[in-house]
Regions:
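Conserved alpha/beta-hydrolase "acid-adjacent" motif
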Residues: 230-236
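Conserved alpha/beta-hydrolase "nucleophile elbow" surrounding the catalytic nucleophile
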Residues: 32-34, 94, 98-100
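Short beta-strand/loop motif that positions the catalytic acidic residue
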Residues: 217, 223-225, 229
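Conserved acidic catalytic loop of the alpha/beta-hydrolase fold
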Residues: 77-94
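Flexible "cap/lid" loop of the alpha/beta hydrolase fold
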Residues: 107-112, 116-155
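Catalytic active-site module of serine/aspartate enzymes centered on a nucleophile-bearing elbow/loop
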Residues: 248-278
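Conserved HGGG/HGGXW glycine-rich cap/lid loop of the alpha/beta-hydrolase fold
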Residues: 13-71
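Conserved alpha/beta-hydrolase catalytic His-Asp/Glu region
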Residues: 129-141, 151-215
Length: 278
């Protein structure tokens, strides 16, 4: 199996998706982070596709090559879109892998649609259980930080995306080996999305309370987080998510940034493979 396609959704919009690998293999479904596309998981898809798995990834609505509707950019709709895709492909015993915002999407998908089609899940640098600082989340990220992200998107999103990559990949740390090409790829992916969809998604990834969704994730779940994640702090998200999940395995990458699917791709690939096969 080697293809990409578009799925027309119930509301008339559509999802671009890739469906690679062995069609008879166990399906691994990837949900990407903001403001990226399915391309952000190409290292993992290539690796696991070569191991005999069926690997699937879509561009979230408002992102990449998917439709750019004015409305519907919230975690419930993202989860329902994912449910439509898994039903369309009739996936069974799937492993869902979500990075950053995609981790929230996976959690809400299971929270709303159950585990009937799901065998396992992996949350990488995920926004679960909630990012923003609230009364019940006093150690969260202040809302003013997300207001600044919104301002950056509106004022000059190309420049903002490029600047964001320094913290995203940890290139602002002493001794870090910067890849200008990776930074440019991030910007290119981000600019494919609609400004309205990406703007609205900031509220979705920062303010959605996913605590109850995590409690409903009764399947084995791998939590991977870098302890130097400057975008989604480990202490606020990864650590807390692992404590809430009923059946969690936590792996902390020492010195790991938010973009560990790229900066630590060999380690991510092997940890995912070991988890899927365990």
């Amino acid at each position: 199996m080697s293809q990409y396609d578009k799925l027309t959704l119930k509301d008339g919009s559509y999802l671009y998706f890739k469906d690679w690998g062995d069609s008879s293999g166990q399906p691994i479904v990837f949900s990407h982070g903001w403001p990226l596309t399915a391309d952000a998981f190409e290292d993992q898809m290539f690796f696991l596709g070569q191991k005999g798995f069926r690997v699937i990834a879509h561009d979230r609505r408002g992102h990449g090559r998917s439709a750019q509707p004015w409305d519907g950019h919230n975690m419930d709709q993202y989860a329902d879109d994912l449910a439509e895709l898994t039903a369309h492909l009739n996936l069974q015993e799937a492993v869902h892998v979500g990075h950053s915002t995609g981790g929230g999407e996976v959690a809400r998908y299971i929270g709303r649609h159950g585990t009937g089609r799901v065998a396992k899940a992996a949350l990488i640098s995920a926004v679960t259980p909630i990012m923003v600082k609230t009364d019940f989340n006093p150690n969260g990220v202040p809302k003013e930080v997300f207001d600044g992200i919104r301002e950056g998107v509106v004022n000059d999103r190309a420049a903002f995306f490029y600047e964001l990559t320094a913290a995203f990949y940890g290139y602002n740390r002493e001794g870090a080996k910067e890849s200008k090409a990776v930074r440019e790829s991030f910007v290119e992916q981000g600019l494919q999305g609609s400004i309205k969809g990406l703007y609205d998604c900031i509220k979705a990834f920062s303010e959605t309370d996913l605590r109850e969704d995590l409690r409903k994730m009764t399947i084995p779940t791998l939590v991977i987080h870098g302890d130097d994640d400057q975008i989604v702090p480990f202490e606020t998200c990864g650590k807390v998510a692992a404590e809430i999940l009923p059946d969690a395995q936590l792996k902390v990458y020492a010195g790991g940034s938010h973009g560990i699917c790229t900066t630590h791709k060999q380690q991510i690939n092997q940890d995912l493979l070991n988890f899927i096969q365990s």
